[in-house]
Amino acid sequence: MKNLKILFAFVLLGFTFSCTVDDEDVDNAPLTILNRIEASSNYTFLNYALQRTGLSNVLNGTEKYTLFAPSNMVMGRFLMQNGFSSIDDVPEELLKNILLNHVIAGELPYRNFETGYAKTAALSDATGLPMSIHIEQVNMRVTLNGEAMITRGNIMASNGIIHTVNRVIPLPTVVTFVTADANFKNLAQAVTREDLTVDLVEVLSTNASNSPAPFTVFAPNNTAFVNLLSELGLSSLGDIDEPTLKTTLTYHVIAETNALSSQLSDNLQLTTLGGNITANVTGGASITDGNNRVSNIVAVDVQANNGVIHVIDKVILPN
């Protein structure tokens, strides 16, 4: 088992996107999460990865967890796409954090999934704090970080619950959340506009240990962009000229800083990639741009591996 190899034929098989939800009472499930994984031939790779990283002990205890479990086929595809020939080839600390990105503290049944954010057990390279995971639930179909879908739910265990997923959930960057969260649809459209002379997706995907990461992103929600277009007398994001769009987007990003909401204070001067802004917290957190326009911070501390996102309700504009 030490040099467990990929069966590449798994990758050639098709995936099913329907979700089967088990209806099994936890009281009738004396097996732990680890026992369930060990007992299933579908999770051979996952079981080996858990054993290799020492996480098997965590999932064999009494504390409650929710595990998003990739099957052998899914693990095989992940290894192949990332240039690994076996689980042993994945650096152990990286493998451990990826696995922890599939673990949420507490028991979360399938019916209780709601669109929003939760925290995983994975730790951000930028802060050492737990990372966020975006959950989207539409018509009882659950997608995680915009990439992995639950295909079988509610495999009950004595210490939690298992949901099978059809993709390994990568460690999120700030870009992951911008593209996964429907509240950032307009922002995602803006940062991916083809005529931008700076590749913001590439920049904001930089590893936390490399400059200009980590990042603090003040991310305008969809309503903020709608109101901006009205303010500017424009009909679409495509009507904003490239220089203005570029300077506006970079004005929402602080480089080499992972500023949590707890670190904000009144009259705090912050330097973004596009100029200075001022943070305030009395009466509700907000930021003020160089034109004295105030944007409220409506959600905070969406933690990625390379930075943090705070959601704002108005697009800020540089001088």
Model-predicted regions and their roles:
Residues 4-6, 19-319:
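Mature, structured domains of secreted/extracytosolic soluble proteins
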Residues 1-17:
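Sec-dependent bacterial lipoprotein signal peptides
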